[in-house]
Swiss-Prot record:
Domain PPIase FKBP-type: 172-257
Localization, UniProt: Cytoplasm
Keyword Manganese: no
Extent of the signal sequence: none
Polar residues bias spans: 439-449, 461-472
Stated name of the protein: Trigger factor
UniProt cross-references to InterPro entries, sorted A to Z: PPIase_dom_sf, PPIase_FKBP_dom, Trig_fac, Trigger_fac_C, Trigger_fac_C_sf, Trigger_fac_ribosome-bd_bac, Trigger_fac_ribosome-bd_sf, Trigger_fact/SurA_dom_sf
SUPFAM superfamilies in the cross-refs: FKBP-like, Triger factor/SurA peptide-binding domain-like, Trigger factor ribosome-binding domain
Family stated for the protein in its record: Belongs to the FKBP-type PPIase family. Tig subfamily.
Organism of provenance: Ureaplasma urealyticum serovar 10 (strain ATCC 33699 / Western)
């Protein structure tokens, strides 16, 4: 074999390999015998039973195209081995994507010329990433947020009992009832509801309303005479007298849970044995939730700016196709959780299949480019993930599946690269946030106030751009 030529551009590298006549003839003879035996096993000729045609007789009926294809297919692995041991290949430090494409360039005088082409792994570069503009991030936990979580926890632990029809409403009871409000015997907008739930003594209604419900029982009706406060938000009702006709449907006795150390211990949280330790734990959970949520939002801002500033070499179609397939399967999997198929989704979103495909291609290109940029930034800034960090992350994830920890650890340990990529992405995002934390937009006051809203304490899912292909 001989290497005839090497052609390289920014997204592919092509080699032309000549298979000489002696090599071709040797493989051709072997292929001819192989095809002849195959032909003999299924050839039908008068005078011979099916499957018993002599090979020598079968050779007269061999398909030469099949022999040619068999010869070529048998030579391809040898050609690849020859090429990948050749200095022109081994001295080239280009990163190639997966297996090459192989085509026949020429067959002349018993010699075969193959074109072996590799897609090159794309390269993404960016001149600077210290000038990214980020919405201000507030990861602080406020007292009212902690107290709200405590109140919610107390409520969830309270003892509840539906009262029988002869028991009366008391302060602290939760009541389900219908009401209809009237002013001068005329119903007013927003003054009526059915099956409304109200905790007596919560002061959710206007003064005097809840107090007049005390002592009523299930099935009882009563007209409550009240007066809207002079500073009531609805100016057409402010200062006016009204009558509310109420019908009691259900009364639930609610015995509040006392906030004490026993209550704190009941959650079986690590190192939580007192009320203060519970508050500290909730405080930390709120901070973690805000960090995750704000990191995810910041990544969306960072990603768009990185894409706008980056230079990316052409992305091979093979990579795009693979990422499109992955993204499509993710969409289908997510839809299946809501018992919706892709066709129904497209109808609901008013998209054609071609539009959906275009969106996937665009997203795939961005995902690939961002993965490359994350790797590039990590390499430039020497950001790495240690094996111990991977093990620690796997252990953390396993804790979320009580009773299945060992199985989860075993499964994740079989694919540590995925965990490492997740952690590397997270480290790079945190690095970029810290690097650009002072690059704020001009109007930040409203944004800061919005970030004080109560977050979900449950851990948010961090956005993760995964690597699209293993490099050769």
């Amino acid at each position: 074999m001989k290497l005839l030529n090497k052609i390289k551009n920014e997204n592919a590298i092509e080699f032309q390999v000549l298979i000489e006549k002696s090599e071709w003839e040797k493989k051709h003879n072997e292929a001819f015998e192989k095809v002849a035996k195959k032909t003999a096993s299924k050839l039908k000729i008068p005078g011979f039973r099916p499957g018993n045609v002599p090979v020598e007789e079968a050779k007269k009926h061999v398909n030469e195209i099949e022999v040619f294809e068999t010869t070529t297919n048998d030579l391809v692995p040898q050609a690849l081995t020859f090429l990948e041991q050749d200095e022109s290949f081994t001295s080239d430090n280009s990163e190639t994507v997966d297996t090459p494409s192989i085509d026949i360039l020429d067959f002349k005088d018993g010699e075969l010329t193959l074109k072996i082409a590799y897609d090159l792994y794309p390269v993404a570069t960016i001149d600077s990433y210290n000038d990214l503009v980020l919405t201000p991030i507030v990861n602080e936990a406020f007292d009212h947020e902690v107290n709200a979580e405590i109140e919610h926890a107390l409520s969830s632990k309270s003892q509840r009992r539906v009262k029988d029809e002869n028991e009366l409403i008391e302060k602290g009871d939760e009541v389900r009832f219908d009401f209809k409000g009237m002013i001068d015997n005329v119903p007013f907008q927003g003054g009526s509801a059915k099956d409304h739930l109200l905790t007596i003594g919560s002061n959710q209604f206007i003064p005097g309303f809840e107090d007049q419900m005390i002592g009523l029982k299930v099935g009882e009706q009563k007209n409550l005479e009240v007066k809207f406060p002079d500073d009531y938000h609805a100016t057409d009702l402010a200062g006016r007298s009204a009558v509310f006709e109420v019908l009691i449907k259900e009364i639930t006795s609610v015995k509040p849970q006392e906030l004490n150390d026993e209550f704190a211990k009941s959650f079986n949280l690590p190192n939580v044995n007192t009320v203060q330790e519970l508050k500290d734990y909730i405080h930390n959970q709120i901070v973690l939730a805000k960090q995750e949520r704000n990191s995810e939002r910041a990544w969306l801002e960072i990603a768009q700016q990185l894409l706008a500033k980056a230079k990316v070499t052409p992305i091979p179609q093979s990579l795009i196709d693979r990422e499109v397939s992955t993204l499509k399967q993710q969409v289908i999997s997510q839809l299946s959780q809501y018992k919706i198929d892709l066709k129904q989704y497209l109808e609901f979103s008013k998209k054609s299949e071609s539009q959906f495909q275009e969106d996937l291609v665009k997203q795939a290109k961005e995902t690939i480019a961002l993965a490359l940029l994350v790797d590039d930034i990590a390499e430039n800034q020497k950001i790495v993930v240690s094996d111990d960090e991977v093990k620690e992350r796997i252990a953390e994830m396993a804790k979320l599946y009580q009773g299945e920890e060992e199985a989860i650890i075993e499964r994740l340990s079989q694919n540590p690269d995925a965990v490492k990529e997740f952690l590397l992405h997270k480290k790079v995002v945190n690095y970029l946030i810290d690097l650009n934390k002072n690059n704020q937009p001009k109007d930040t006051a409203s944004t800061l106030s919005k970030q004080e809203d109560k977050p979900k304490v449950a851990k948010a899912k961090t956005s993760n751009t995964k690597k699209v292909a293993s490099k050769k």
